[in-house]
Amino acid sequence: MNAILQPHQHFNKVDFKPKDYKDEKTPSFWCAGCGHYGVLTGLLRALAELGVDPNHLVSVSGIGCSSRLPYFVNSYKMHTLHGRAGPVATGVHLARPDLAVVVSGGDGDGFSIGG
């Protein structure tokens, strides 16, 4: 089974805006000046530009500050074990290829701890 995102599966011609992907929660526990605010803003803009349907979006994260990102995205959410966000996201895609999957993680989560 191919785990590569096929554009026609998740993108449509509906004119989504970044606010369509923003959950009701407002990030308030990242440190002032933290780069995660920029990552969140960039992700919301990219999802809108690509036209990913929020009802067909899954956000997967591991442990750490970056793991909070899915809570601010209007999507299905999965908080996984440290170092397992990538494998879990792959499993989600293999089980539900009709859904778009976004993974967030930090350096420890992605490269050195738990994997």
Label for each model-derived stretch:
Residues 56-62:
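A short beta-strand-loop structural module common to alpha/beta enzyme folds
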Residues 1-30, 36-56, 98:
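Iron-sulfur (Fe-S) cluster-binding modules
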Residues 63-115:
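Thiamine diphosphate
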Residues 31-35, 77-80:
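Catalytic cores of large soluble enzymes that bind and process phosphate-bearing ligands
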